Amino acid sequence: GSAGVLRVRAPRVGATAAADVGTEIAVDALAANLDGVRRIEVEGFKVYGSTANTTVNSTLIGRIESDNAAFAGIGGERSDAILARLTANDASLADRTSVRAGVELRSTGNITMSSAWNLSTFDDNGSLARPGGQPVNLTVRAQRDLTVSASLSDGLRNSNGPASAIAPEAAIVGTGADLRLVGGADLSAADPLAVIASADDIAPAGNLTIGRSNTDVIVR
């Protein structure tokens, strides 16, 4: 971690019978007496993989959001249960630990993000609505080209929303989503940011492109 922040990333486990939705994280209980740790962020991620070119559209986004909600549980009771298990050895860690839903999109081909995606939404009172009350971390890894042709954000309102719905939430350091966008990704690597080394060190295995002609595309 950095500045006393410990980040733990592990896959979701415990798929339900009805759908492939993990409701636990493959992480043992945290050790007691973690000196110098100011904040602990635990990400339970689910992989959506493909061996073909992939388009991230509203249908796939809806499926992912449903899975994230199932992971956190209504009112966050499942993520709260994970938190209690992780901090069982040292209850003082509970106030410093958060459990986040993570999403990893992988493809051995190209990935095109064609639909606007807001990782957080707002309720009727203008407050941020997130799975378990925590940001969602998003990792997109295309072995070839990754094209972001629609806006991607974490909780910022669309400018054409109603003026009466003013979010009382303020942007606070450390509470936003982590976004990792990788073209030419090395899918065999444990590091989600790893890329494939090109044979001649000039031509990349894949590219990351943000934007499209005559359209505002914002990643924020």
Q: Where do the language-model regions lie?
A:
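Extracellular and secretory-pathway beta-repeat/beta-biased strand scaffolds
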Residues: 1-220
